[in-house]
Amino acid sequence: MNLVERFAEAFNRRDVDGLLGCFTEDANYRDLFYGPHAGQAALRGMFERMFREGRDYRWQMDTIVMDARRAAAEWTFSYTATAAVPRSEGRRVRFSGMSVFELGGGELESGRARAYREYADTGVALLQLGFAPESLAKVLSRRLPTA
């Protein structure tokens, strides 16, 4: 089983230790909703928060492309928001995206990622979570490139 498959399986099991085993001690992880995190302690906190704020996770890796230094995956992600997110409690969210894993040590099958980043249309997820279109416009406008 390769790194991407191990990551998805650990996530779907809500296995924080299994997830941490996919990353180097000093790994950088850039999450679309939770922002950037560096190092195992920060990653642990982020994953624990995710699992408090959501349930019934399903992270399906639809396509995986890899070489000796990186892996990229197209995916479909879904979950249900919990009471930890009162404005969205009980809402089911489903969206697609892509992730890039930069490998530490360069060996995909048994290696760990030193960096992770993901790309998706967060607007779709935020609408499903019940954000008003006006609020969504405000949030997304912060991402517009500046000259």
Locate predicted features.
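A structural signal for well-ordered alpha-helical scaffolds and beta->alpha junctions
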Residues: 4, 40-43, 94
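A solvent-exposed, acidic/Ser-Thr-rich amphipathic alpha-helical stretch
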Residues: 16-20, 24-70
